Amino acid sequence: MTTHIPLPEWTDLIAAVLSLPPDEDALSKSWRGQDNAAIWYSRGSWVLAAVAKQLAQSKTASPLKFWIPDYFCNQSTVALREVGAKLVFYPIGEDLVPDWQRCDAMAKEEQPDIFLAVHYFGRPMDMARARQFCDSHEALL
């Protein structure tokens, strides 16, 4: 059989089975604070749920309002729903940029606790504008 993909050598397979797992502390050392610990998750949605759960424990009002763009994978919200976060879907335009005027109007009715910024298809969101929105509505970004 001819493949276009390079096949591993037997030594690569043996090393993969017998090698020790990487040191998680060493892997995270370059980006975590000196006195901080790193927590590893297998899915980004579990991270969102952990953040929501932690923040919900520290605030008095409930439920936690987690703002997510209205074009977002539903499967990624399952863990957030399980921890009791209230999902508020904020409007984005055809250019996949938040409609900031409508977001400001929505925030007057229901202030966000967490605002999830999404970089669609490799295009970075205007994070300065997102930070401005979050600062004016006392939300985490």
Outline where the language-model segments fall.
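Short, well-ordered alpha-helical microsegments
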Residues: 48-49, 74-77, 124-127
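Conserved PLP-anchoring active-site segment centered on the Schiff-base-forming lysine
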Residues: 52-110
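Conserved PLP-binding active-site segment in aminotransferase class I/II-type PLP enzymes
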Residues: 1-61, 83
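Hydrophobic anchor at the start of a short beta-strand
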Residues: 38, 87, 141
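Residue-level signal for well-ordered alpha-helical scaffold segments within enzymatic catalytic domains
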Residues: 50-53, 78, 119, 132
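Short beta->alpha linker loops
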Residues: 42-43, 71-72, 121-122
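Active-site phosphate-binding strand-loop segment of PLP-dependent enzymes
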Residues: 94-141
